[in-house]
Regions:
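Switch/connector loops and helix/strand junctions flanking conserved nucleotide-binding motifs
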Residues: 93-99, 187-191, 227-232, 270-274
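Flexible beta-alpha connector loops of hexameric P-loop NTPases
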Residues: 113-118, 141-144, 189-199, 232-244
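Helical hairpin unit composed of two closely spaced alpha helices linked by a short loop
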Residues: 86, 169-208, 217
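Cytosolic-facing regulatory segments adjacent to core modules
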Residues: 19, 34, 43, 77-174
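Amphipathic alpha-helical transducer elements in NTP-driven molecular machines
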Residues: 33-36, 95, 122-125, 129, ...
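Phosphate-binding/switch region of NTP-binding enzymes
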Residues: 205-297
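The Walker A/P-loop phosphate-binding site
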Residues: 2-108
C-alpha cells in the first residue's frame, strides 16, 4: 500500500467542491441560520461548518448576549440539523451565565433576579424556570476551568471523539458542533508563549487546524484595543465611529484565521448622536446596537 502524501491532486479539490455545491443546491448541506436576516445576507446564508466567527466589542456591549442568541437561535431556526454545543466560559460560573441569560430573556436586571433590587416575584421566577426547562432540551456542555491552548486542543479533540461514530466502511463520522469561546484573552498561556499576543497567534492556528479536521463552527468573543476610546473616535459623524479591523484585540493574530469578523458597538453609550460618515441617527440611545461585518470570507 502506498504511503499517503501530504498533498492532494487538483482533481480531488474540484471533485470535493462540486460535491459541496451539489449538496447545497439540493439542500442537503446548509449553513446555520441566525436570528438576523442581515447577518445571513452578509454571510453564506448564516454560519458555515468548518468556520471561525470572531466577535469583538467593548465590555458591557452585549457580545455574550449575541453569542447566546446565536446558540439558542441555532437550535430554534435549524430544527432539522443534528448538532451539539460546547461552550468555554472562563469569565463566570455556569450558574451566573445562566442568570445573565434569564436577564436578557426577561429584560430584567441581574440584581433584581438575585433579589438584590427588590424581591424577585413568583411570576418572574416561573418565567426563569420555564426558560431553563426549555434550554435543557438542547445538548449543550460547558467548560468552566481555564485552560491553555494545549489543553484547549485536547478537550476539543476528546469531545469530538466522544460524540463520533464509525460507519460500515470503518470511517469515523464526527458530529457537527458549535464551539464558543467567551473572552479569548482568558485562556492561559502555554509554555513557550511569551505574552497574550503569542497566545492569540497560537489560538488562531489551533482553531484553523481543528476546523479543518472536524465539522466545527467556532464563535470566539474578543475585546477591543483601547484606541477605540480615543475622544476623536467618538465625535459625531466620523469614520472612526465604526469598529475597524485594527480595533480587534490581537487583530493580526486572529484576522487571517477568521472566516467572519464582526465588531459590535453601542454608539449611544459614547453620547454619539450621528453615527459614521453616513450620519445614522442614534441620538445618544444606548440601546441601539450596531453590527459591523468587517470580514466575510
Amino acid at each position: 500500500m502506498n504511503k499517503p502524501t501530504k498533498w492532494k491532486t487538483q482533481k480531488e479539490a474540484f471533485v470535493e467542491s462540486l460535491s459541496y455545491l451539489e449538496g447545497r443546491k439540493k439542500g442537503k448541506i446548509t449553513s446555520i441560520k441566525t436570528p438576523w436576516q442581515s447577518f445571513n445576507n452578509a454571510t453564506t446564508d448564516g454560519i458555515e461548518w468548518h468556520s471561525t466567527t470572531v466577535i469583538g466589542a467593548r465590555p458591557a456591549t452585549g457580545k455574550t448576549l449575541i453569542k447566546d442568541l446565536l446558540v439558542n437561535g441555532a437550535f430554534k431556526l435549524n430544527p432539522l440539523m443534528n448538532f451539539r454545543v460546547l461552550e468555554f466560559q472562563f469569565e463566570m460560573l455556569g450558574k451566573n451565565s445562566a442568570i445573565r441569560e434569564y436577564s436578557g430573556h426577561l429584560q430584567k436586571s441581574y440584581k433584581y433576579l438575585c433579589s438584590a433590587d427588590g424581591q424577585l416575584t413568583d411570576e418572574d421566577f416561573e418565567k426563569c424556570r420555564v426558560y431553563a426547562k426549555d434550554k435543557l432540551k438542547y445538548p449543550i456542555d460547558v467548560v468552566e476551568e481555564p485552560c491553555n491552548m494545549i489543553e484547549f486542543r485536547e478537550i476539543v479533540q476528546e469531545y469530538m471523539n466522544l460524540h463520533s461514530s464509525v460507519n460500515e466502511e470503518g470511517k469515523r463520522l464526527y458530529k457537527n458542533t458549535i464551539i464558543t469561546l467567551d473572552h479569548s484573552l482568558l485562556l492561559k498561556r502555554s509554555p513557550g508563549e511569551k505574552d497574550k499576543f503569542d497566545m492569540l497567534y497560537t489560538l488562531g492556528e489551533t482553531l484553523t487546524a481543528l476546523k479543518r479536521k472536524y465539522p466545527i463552527a467556532f464563535i470566539v468573543l474578543s475585546q477591543l484595543n483601547r484606541s477605540i476610546d480615543a475622544p476623536e473616535r467618538n465625535e459625531d459623524g466620523k469614520y472612526g465611529n465604526f469598529i475597524l479591523e485594527s480595533d480587534i484585540m490581537g487583530a493580526d493574530a486572529l484576522l487571517q484565521h477568521a472566516d467572519t469578523l464582526i465588531g459590535l458597538n453601542r454608539p449611544g453609550k459614547q453620547k454619539i448622536k450621528y453615527y459614521g460618515v453616513e450620519r445614522y441617527i442614534v441620538d445618544g440611545d444606548p440601546t441601539i446596537l450596531a453590527m459591523h461585518f468587517i470580514k466575510c470570507r
